[in-house]
Amino acid sequence: MSINVEQAIIHSISQDGEGQLSCRLRPQPLLNSQAVEAMLEELHQTYTTKAGKGFGHFGINGEDGEANTKFEEALTTYRSGELGFVEFSGIAGKLLQEELAKYDFSTGGFLLLSCYTYMTSDYLFVSLLNAKSSMTVLDDMELSQNTHLDLNNVQLAARIDLTEWQADPESKKYISFIRGRAGRKVADFFLDFMGCVEGVNTKAQNKSLMNAVEDFVGNSELTKDERQQARERVFDYCTERCDEGASIQIKDLADELADQGMDSFYDFAQGGNYELEEEFPGDKPTLRQLKKFSGTGGGVTLSFDGQHLGERVIYDPVSDTIIIKGVPANLKDQLDRRLKGE
């Protein structure tokens, strides 16, 4: 299903020779052209399927320190019809410029804001895009350098579910955002300019769900194969929700398992010490552990499907060893050739 683009605009934030940032505001929205729709559709798909996103909400002064409420106030005024989209986007551009000026690592970029509808929800997509140089061949076979937006490597982006925000202002997850790379805080300024604070620990919720599923199947009378099928059903449901950009709902998941003959998961999950929310965003890297075991350390990397544990892969925790029966053919060939060489 395609998105329905309502408004979109791009502003430029650049640095002059003295290192001062300035924001050049576009005076009117982007034309609703095929190029604009294609770009936003690509960004929507890329963003929706991107793993490891964080989730939060607008901060509140006092509760969340000195929260920056200017972005939320401008967005509220825009949604009420008292402020035009161009004017709202201009306020956002100036707020981002002010936030970027506090740091010495940024040279700016192109601020994209777009309001669009997908399925039954309205969204505001906000991203700081970078330009990238590339080479092209002209008609006379000469090379020419041009510049284009780097849509394949978006690192600074957030999406506000406007429908959820206005229907449930107390929600802690109506803003999603791309997390910064491990150990880096570069993306923090992007959340600060919007006044966003993290509200849901997505990885922790997904880990708790995995623990609940493992305990549930472990306490059941299911066979080994049936237990693995249950894990895979949970994985399939959760990844489908991730791909759709929707939250995992414990009640729906329990119904999925009940259809497979595994009743009472909802009561089990809510009755334990799992501290699971009724619904929360999925995290594919964490959920993948339902189907696969993998680990790296000391120069050794090992990965195998969960169904092989106890059969092709034997783990002995006492001796701290793993025995693999039926070595993969390509690995066996490499090992045999190395032994012959020695």
Curated annotation (Swiss-Prot):
The keyword Acetylation is assigned to this record: no
Protein localization: Cytoplasm, Nucleoid
GO cellular component, one term: cytoplasm
Main location: cytoplasm
GO molecular function: double-stranded DNA binding; single-stranded RNA binding
Keyword Cytoplasm applies: yes
InterPro entries xrefs: Nucleoid_associated_NdpA
Record keywords: Cytoplasm
Protein family per UniProt: Belongs to the YejK family.
Protein name: Nucleoid-associated protein Spea_1765
Origin species: Shewanella pealeana (strain ATCC 700345 / ANG-SQ1)
Upper taxonomic lineage: Bacteria, Pseudomonadati, Pseudomonadota, Gammaproteobacteria, Alteromonadales
